[in-house]
Amino acid sequence: MYSVNIEPDGSNHSPSRKRLKQILWGLMLVLSVTIYGSHAPLIYLCKVNGEIPFSSSAVVLLIELSKFVISLVFFLIQDWKSLKASVSWHLAAPYAVPAVLYGANNNLVVYIQHFMDPSSFQVLSNLKIVSTAVLYSLFLRQRLSVRRWLSVFLLLAAGVFYSYGGIQDLEKVSSDTNLYVTLPGLLLMLAYCLISGLSAVYTEMTLKTQKIPLNMQNLYLYSFGIIINLTAHLTSSKNSDFFDGFSVWVWVIILSQALNGLIMSLVMKLSNNITRLFIISFSMLANGFLSFILFQLQLTALFFLAVVLIGLAVYMYYGMK
């Protein structure tokens, strides 16, 4: 059985060393929340005349390359002696699965929005919280108590409320928003949420079952990610320059998302996908506060309701006995 603690295991260390590791772990989670929450504001800062000026496929490819390079540096520093035992196609092959699933979902996101409006997409995409928890429970054989299942559904409710109207631009409020969801759109959304949960849970399962260094596992994972995203870029990009539209803010996005990808690998190796779900939920709140501070967007009652629900979910999952 895998641990469901939010902190990594520190039982073999002295109390002071264990405490230090818990503090560092907590700071890492806060950093991850901040990076997740700042992604949308950073995208906004990149826009020129209201449009995104760069190729999204180029940015995603550079994020994968950055994660690979950082993992390679850490591997050469920390795990070089284990190279011979860690390199084989048998160990590498499982990492092709999440790379393909992530690639499929990236394309599915675009296709789904032909069958529903963006607001409905944002609200319904929160179903991946439940799909991830269900698949985590099934594939990793983690039986969640009724109390913990309730906390998962509280995260779902918080995500729905936040997506529906947690923040609001008072200058662009309109009552004429055309909300619609078609049956094909709903079915595609269910597929998207299942694939999202499956890719995350499969990655966690692979990271935990293989007895090789995490840095080597990351190299395998990001190698396939580079192949998939390079293929996507070459097939979708126009004849524009690869770095066309890049600014300082774009590079901040690339480096921060690369760092967050490495943090997520560590979270899934030492903790689990439930911790990851809490990080993503808290990042919504970080996004709301940053949007309020940077862009003077209005925090609505639904935002504060989401804050309460997430706080209650944390207490129910980790605090109640």
From Swiss-Prot:
SUPFAM superfamilies assigned to the protein according to its UniProt record, in alphabetical order: Multidrug resistance efflux transporter EmrE
Gene Ontology CC: one annotated term: Golgi membrane
Entry keywords, A to Z: Golgi apparatus, Membrane, Sugar transport, Transmembrane, Transmembrane helix, Transport
Lumenal side: 44-56, 113-119, 171-180, 233-247
Pfam families: Nuc_sug_transp (PF04142)
Topological category with respect to the lipid bilayer: Multi-pass membrane protein
Positions of transmembrane segments: 23-43, 57-77, 92-112, 120-140, 150-170, 181-201, 212-232, 248-268
An annotated Gene Ontology molecular function: pyrimidine nucleotide-sugar transmembrane transporter activity
Cytoplasmic topology ranges: 1-22, 78-91, 141-149, 202-211, 269-321
Coarse class of the protein's main subcellular location: Golgi
Matching InterPro entries: Nuc_sug_transpt
Superkingdom of this protein's organism: Eukaryota
Coiled coil regions, renumbered to chain: none
Protein purpose: Mediates the transport of CDP-ribitol. Does not exhibit CMP-sialic acid, UDP-galactose and UDP-N-acetylglucosamine transport activity.
NCBIfam families, A to Z: nst
Family label: Belongs to the nucleotide-sugar transporter family. SLC35A subfamily.
Cited PANTHER family: NUCLEOTIDE-SUGAR TRANSMEMBRANE TRANSPORTER
Name listed for the protein in its UniProt record: Probable UDP-sugar transporter protein SLC35A4
